[in-house]
C-alpha cells in the first residue's frame, strides 16, 4: 500500500498535511468532483521524510498497515517533539505495543485504543498529555472512510471539512469525530509520494506466459524498491522445466513524473535433453500497469531489447550480461570472477548448465562431498582434520559462485568460506562479494550448535563465543584494501537467531536496510518458503553509530508480513528478537 502525504496550504499562516491511502483513489476522487490540484508539485520521498513532515501544531499521526511498524528513531522523534498517534491495522496491535516496550516508561506513556472510529473523540483528552503515544487499532476501511470524510464536494479545490466531520464507524453507526482543527477552504500545494515502512509494499508483480512448447507460465517476478528483480520459482503453476535465473530493471528517464517507464529484462532457462539455455524472455511495464512485450536477440555478451513503449515510439538499447544478472558497474563484474569448476571428477549426469558467465550446478551435493567442507566451530574432530592452509582469493571466489548459484536455484547454502582470518584479504573480498553479488548476504555458518545455547541470549557473543563485529569494522578493513566504499557496504547488517530448532538463512536486499528476506528450513520439513519481514530498528547511519560505539544492545525487532503460508492459515508468524551476528570467521586453531 502506498502512502501519500497531501500538503495543504491554508489561507492562514498555518500549513498542514493529511494522509491519503492510495493515489489512484485520490485521482478518482479528484476526477469525480472535478477538483484541481492548482499546480501542485508531485515529488517522491522516503517514509522517514514523510513521517517527519506530516505534522501540525497539535498532533502528529502515523498510519501503519497491519504488518508495518515505525522505526525507533521515528517514534522517539515524535515523542520528543509532539504528541503523536500511531494507527495500525487490526491484527498486530499487541505486537505493535510489544515492539514499543523499549520506549515505554513513566515519562513516555503509551495509550492503546480500540478499533472504533469514534476513538478520535478520545484524542481530545490524549493531546493534552505531553510526550505520550497513542496506538489506535483501526481497520483499514474504517480509516479510509474517516480520511475521505475530511474532503468536501466543493468544485475547484480539495478542502477539509469543518471541525466535526461526520464519519461512519465500523459498526455502521454515524458518529462525529473531531481531530485537529483544520481551516476550511485549504487547497493542495504539493503531494509527497512516500511508502509505508519498507519496500515490499512498493512491489509490482509481473506475470508472463513463456513461449516454450508446453506453455508453462514464468514464475512470479517482484520488483523491489531498488529496482532489482527477484524471481520466485516452485509455485504450483510454474513448471520445474522453466526457471528464471536472472533479471534486471532498466529505467527510461522521462520528464513527467507520472510517465516513468521501467523495462524488465528476464533471463530464462528451459531445460531440455541437451541441458541448454533455450530462451530469454523480456517485457516492459509502465506505471499504468500495462505490459508490453519486447523483441529480443541474445548475443555472446549482451541482450538486445527493442520494441514500442507508450509515448516513446520504437526504442532499442543493449544491456550487458553482467547487468542482466544484477551486477552493476560499481560492483564486481562477473567476468572478473574465475569460472566455477567442480572438485574432482563429474559424471555426465552432473554436468553444469552454462548460462553465459553464470554456471549453475545441477546437483550441489557433489560440491559438498568433494570440496573442502566448512569447519564447524563446535566440532573438535573436524577441527583436527581441517586443512589449515590459507585459502586464496580464487578459491574463495569459486565458493562464492557456488553460493550464488545455490540461491539462484532457491536452495539453502551455508557460507563455505571457513578458516579465514577476519584480516585475510580473501575473507574480506568474500564478505564484500556476498554483500553485492545478486544483492544477497549469506551469514557465515548459520546453523544451530549445542554449545550456542548458553550464549544464545548474549548479544555480545557470536557463534563460537567470538566477539561480535559490526559493519563499521569490516568497512574499515575493506577501505584499507580498497575493496569497497561506504555506499556499498553500509546497508548490510549480519543477523542471526535461533527459533525453536529452526534454521534460518538470511539474505538482505541490496541497498535496502529495512527489508530482509528469509528462507526457513525446518528439519524434517520438505517445503521451503520465503517470508518478507520488516526490521523494526534504526536507520543505517544510526545502526553504524551504535555498532561503532560497541553498543551491542542495538537490536532489530522483526515481525512477519503475514503473507504467504502464514496469511493462508490466518496465523501469526512470530520471530525472535535478534542481535547482530558475528562477522568473525570460525576459529580454526589446531587442538593439542
Swiss-Prot record:
The keyword Glycosyltransferase does not apply. Residues 450-469 are annotated as: Disordered. The keyword Transport applies. Disulfide bonds: none annotated. One of its GO terms (molecular function) is nucleotide binding. GO terms for biological process: symbiont-mediated suppression of host innate immune response; transport of virus in host, cell to cell. It is found in: Host cell junction, Host plasmodesma. Keywords: Host cell junction, Host-virus interaction, Inhibition of host innate immune response by virus, Nucleotide-binding, RNA-binding, Suppressor of RNA silencing, Transport, Viral immunoevasion, Viral movement protein. One of its GO terms (cellular component) is host cell plasmodesma. Transports viral genome to neighboring plant cells directly through plasmosdesmata, without any budding. The movement protein allows efficient cell to cell propagation, by bypassing the host cell wall barrier. Displays sequence non-specific nucleic acid binding activity. Acts as a suppressor of RNA-mediated gene silencing, also known as post-transcriptional gene silencing (PTGS), a mechanism of plant viral defense that limits the accumulation of viral RNAs. This is Movement and RNA silencing protein VP6. It comes from Rice ragged stunt virus (isolate Thailand) (RRSV). The lineage of its organism: Viruses, Riboviria, Orthornavirae, Duplornaviricota, Resentoviricetes.
Amino acid at each position: 500500500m502506498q502512502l501519500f502525504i497531501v500538503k495543504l496550504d491554508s489561507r492562514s499562516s498555518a500549513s498542514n498535511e493529511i494522509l491519503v491511502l492510495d493515489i489512484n483513489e485520490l485521482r478518482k476522487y479528484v476526477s469525480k468532483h472535478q477538483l484541481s490540484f492548482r499546480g501542485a508539485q508531485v515529488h517522491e520521498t522516503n517514509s522517514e521524510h514523510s513521517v517527519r513532515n506530516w505534522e501540525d501544531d497539535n498532533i502528529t499521526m502515523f498510519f501503519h498497515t497491519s504488518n508495518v511498524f515505525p522505526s525507533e528513531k521515528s517514534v522517539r522523534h515524535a515523542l520528543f517533539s509532539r504528541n503523536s498517534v500511531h494507527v495500525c491495522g487490526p491484527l498486530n496491535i499487541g505486537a505493535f505495543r510489544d515492539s514499543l516496550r523499549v520506549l515505554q516508561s513513566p515519562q513516555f506513556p503509551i495509550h492503546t485504543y480500540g478499533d472504533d472510529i469514534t476513538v478520535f473523540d478520545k484524542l481530545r483528552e490524549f493531546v493534552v498529555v505531553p510526550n505520550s503515544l497513542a496506538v489506535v487499532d483501526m481497520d483499514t476501511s474504517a480509516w479510509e472512510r474517516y480520511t475521505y470524510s475530511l474532503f468536501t464536494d466543493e468544485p475547484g479545490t480539495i478542502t477539509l471539512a469543518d471541525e466535526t466531520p461526520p464519519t461512519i464507524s465500523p459498526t455502521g453507526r454515524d458518529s462525529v469525530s473531531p481531530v485537529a482543527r483544520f481551516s476550511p477552504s485549504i487547497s493542495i500545494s504539493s503531494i509527497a509520494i512516500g511508502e509505508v515502512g519498507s519496500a515490499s509494499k512498493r512491489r509490482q508483480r509481473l506475470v508472463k506466459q513463456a513461449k516454450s512448447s508446453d506453455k508453462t507460465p514464468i514464475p512470479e517476478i517482484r520488483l523491489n524498491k531498488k529496482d532489482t528483480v527477484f524471481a520466485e520459482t516452485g509455485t504450483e503453476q510454474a513448471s520445474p522445466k522453466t526457471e528464471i535465473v536472472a533479471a534486471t530493471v532498466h529505467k527510461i528517464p522521462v520528464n513527467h513524473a507520472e510517465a516513468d517507464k521501467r523495462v524488465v529484462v528476464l533471463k530464462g532457462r528451459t531445460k531440455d535433453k541437451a541441458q541448454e539455455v533455450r530462451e530469454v524472455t523480456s517485457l516492459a511495464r509502465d506505471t499504468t500497469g500495462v505490459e508490453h512485450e519486447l523483441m529480443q536477440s541474445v548475443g555472446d555478451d549482451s541482450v538486445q531489447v527493442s520494441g514500442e513503449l507508450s509515448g516513446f515510439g520504437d526504442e532499442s538499447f543493449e544491456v550487458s550480461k553482467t547487468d542482466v544478472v544484477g551486477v552493476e558497474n560499481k560492483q564486481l563484474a562477473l567476468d572478473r570472477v574465475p569460472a566455477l569448476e567442480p572438485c574432482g571428477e563429474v559424471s555426465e549426469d552432473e554436468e553444469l548448465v552454462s548460462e553465459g558467465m553464470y554456471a549453475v550446478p545441477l546437483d550441489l551435493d557433489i560440491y559438498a562431498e568433494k570440496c573442502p567442507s566448512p569447519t564447524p566451530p563446535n566440532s573438535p574432530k573436524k577441527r583436527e582434520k581441517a586443512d589449515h592452509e590459507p585459502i586464496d582469493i580464487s578459491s574463495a571466489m569459486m565458493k562464492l559462485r557456488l553460493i550464488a548459484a545455490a540461491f539462484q536455484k532457491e536452495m539453502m547454502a551455508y557460507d563455505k568460506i571457513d578458516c579465514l582470518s577476519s584480516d585475510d584479504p580473501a575473507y574480506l573480498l568474500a564478505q564484500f562479494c556476498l554483500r553485492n553479488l545478486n544483492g544477497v548476504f549469506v551469514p557465515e555458518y548459520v546453523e544451530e550448535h549445542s554449545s550456542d545455547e548458553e550464549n544464545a541470549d548474549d548479544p555480545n557473543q557470536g557463534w563460537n563465543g567470538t566477539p561480535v563485529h559490526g559493519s563499521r569494522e569490516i568497512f574499515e578493513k575493506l577501505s584499507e584494501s580498497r575493496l569497497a566504499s561506504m555506499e556499498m557496504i553500509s546497508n548490510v547488517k549480519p543477523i542471526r537467531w535461533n527459533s525453536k530448532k529452526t534454521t534460518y538463512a538470511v539474505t538482505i536486499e541490496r541497498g535496502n536496510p529495512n527489508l530482509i528476506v528469509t528462507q526457513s528450513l525446518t528439519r524434517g520439513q520438505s517445503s521451503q518458503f520465503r517470508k518478507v519481514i520488516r526490521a523494526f530498528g534504526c536507520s543505517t547511519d544510526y545502526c553504524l553509530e551504535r555498532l561503532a560505539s560497541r553498543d551491542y544492545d542495538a537490536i532489530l525487532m522483526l515481525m512477519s508480513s503475514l503473507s504467504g503460508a502464514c496469511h493462508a492459515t490466518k496465523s501469526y508468524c512470530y520471530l525472535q528478537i535478534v542481535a547482530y551476528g558475528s562477522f568473525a570467521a570460525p576459529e580454526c586453531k589446531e587442538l593439542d
